[in-house]
């Protein structure tokens, strides 16, 4: 069973629908016991970094998610991916979950923001749907795929059991479903592979 973390920030219904379309058993919850029983966790997110971190703190999820990320497959989507890092410079400096070393920084001012629409992944060679103005800055060894948008923007990162997708797989049609399926089949079944 996959649990989608419900903390009041995210495109939960579409993610739930996409995972169910792949035949997954899915629950949406903020209950720590149920989240702890799940085989894998998905952290969605839409909006701004600081309010999202505040919601995680209000719901008592921060330490729990930090611990769970060392025990089971953990997928952050869009803002959920950004929250995995140590901090963001959005609206000042905001501390993140610190599950992945690295920061989240505003995309360059010489490109149109937000970065919205379809963009081709360099390694997978297929287009996925993005909506964001900030992107991760992290160790290149963890970047599974990326796009160029004013700078190199990590689109998929993976370290140990933790995976992040900056784009919205649930809004990326068949390609998004394929990438979610790859995450489920590889990351959830073996920590030695990457998507």
From Swiss-Prot:
Record-listed E.C. numbers: 4.3.2.10, 3.5.1.2
Subcellular locations according to the entry: Cytoplasm
Active-site residue list: 78, 168, 170
Keyword line: Amino-acid biosynthesis, Cytoplasm, Glutamine amidotransferase, Histidine biosynthesis, Hydrolase, Lyase
BP term (GO), one: L-histidine biosynthetic process
A Pfam match: GATase
Main location: cytoplasm
Pathway(s) it belongs to: Amino-acid biosynthesis; L-histidine biosynthesis; L-histidine from 5-phospho-alpha-D-ribose 1-diphosphate: step 5/9
PROSITE patterns to which the protein is assigned, alphabetical: GATASE_TYPE_1 (PS51273)
MF terms in GO: glutaminase activity; imidazoleglycerol-phosphate synthase activity; lyase activity
UniProt keyword Cytoplasm, yes or no: yes
GO cellular component: cytoplasm
Reaction catalysed by this enzyme: 5-[(5-phospho-1-deoxy-D-ribulos-1-ylimino)methylamino]-1-(5-phospho-beta-D-ribosyl)imidazole-4-carboxamide + L-glutamine = D-erythro-1-(imidazol-4-yl)glycerol 3-phosphate + 5-amino-1-(5-phospho-beta-D-ribosyl)imidazole-4-carboxamide + L-glutamate + H(+); L-glutamine + H2O = L-glutamate + NH4(+)
Domain Glutamine amidotransferase type-1: 1-193
InterPro entries assigned: Class_I_gatase-like, GATASE, Imidazole-glycPsynth_HisH
HAMAP family hit by this protein: HisH (MF_00278)
Job description of the protein: IGPS catalyzes the conversion of PRFAR and glutamine to IGP, AICAR and glutamate. The HisH subunit catalyzes the hydrolysis of glutamine to glutamate and ammonia as part of the synthesis of IGP and AICAR. The resulting ammonia molecule is channeled to the active site of HisF.
NCBIfam families reported in the protein's UniProt record: IMP_synth_hisH
Complexes and interactors: Heterodimer of HisH and HisF.
Entry protein name: Imidazole glycerol phosphate synthase subunit HisH
Organism of origin: Exiguobacterium sibiricum (strain DSM 17290 / CCUG 55495 / CIP 109462 / JCM 13490 / 255-15)
Encoding gene, per UniProt annotation: hisH
